[in-house]
A protein has these predicted regions:
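Conserved subregion of the PPM/PP2C metallophosphatase catalytic domain
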Residues: 2-26, 30-32, 36-148
Length: 148
């Protein structure tokens, strides 16, 4: 019930970008599903507004702390934007497993790492945006979760 993936709409604020969010909410069953649905709504609402990835994730984190702080619930998140115009990736990692970047030309794998704690834990958490430039056709990004 707590696994999450989505493609938040950002076309008005970042034309040409493609955004992917994947996460996992703590717990199981109906409580986890409700927390995931709420987190999804927060993220979708914030993603359509102007702002950097850091601002988006920070705002969602603060809202989750307000809503779930006393329950001990939290959500991991990997938030990735593909900038098709400039051929680069931007991402924030908030406690989620790193994504894997595969380049078939060099037959190499790279973990897209980054610092950041899960959402809903600390009102003052700091998140950092990371990037990878020079994207080429055929490269693959793998995102995963522990759910089915």
């Amino acid at each position: 019930g707590g696994d999450y993936y989505d493609f938040p709409e950002t076309s008005e604020t970042h034309p040409g970008d493609f955004t992917v969010a994947i996460g996992d909410v703590s717990g199981h069953g109906i409580p986890a599903a409700l927390m995931m649905a709420t987190a999804r709504a927060f993220l979708r609402q914030r993603s359509i507004l102007p702002g950097t990835l850091v601002e988006i994730v920070s705002d969602v984190n603060q809202q989750m702390v307000r809503d779930f702080g006393e329950t001990g619930g939290f959500m991991t998140l990997f938030y990735l934007t593909i900038d098709t115009k400039n051929k680069c990736l931007h991402w924030i990692r908030a406690g989620h497993d790193p994504a894997i970047f595969y380049d078939p030309q060099t037959d190499t794998f790279e973990e897209l790492r980054g610092d950041g704690i899960a959402l809903g834990v600390d009102m003052d958490a700091h998140f950092a945006q990371y990037q990878r430039t020079n994207l080429k056709r055929g490269q693959i990004i793998l995102l995963g979760s522990d759910g089915p």
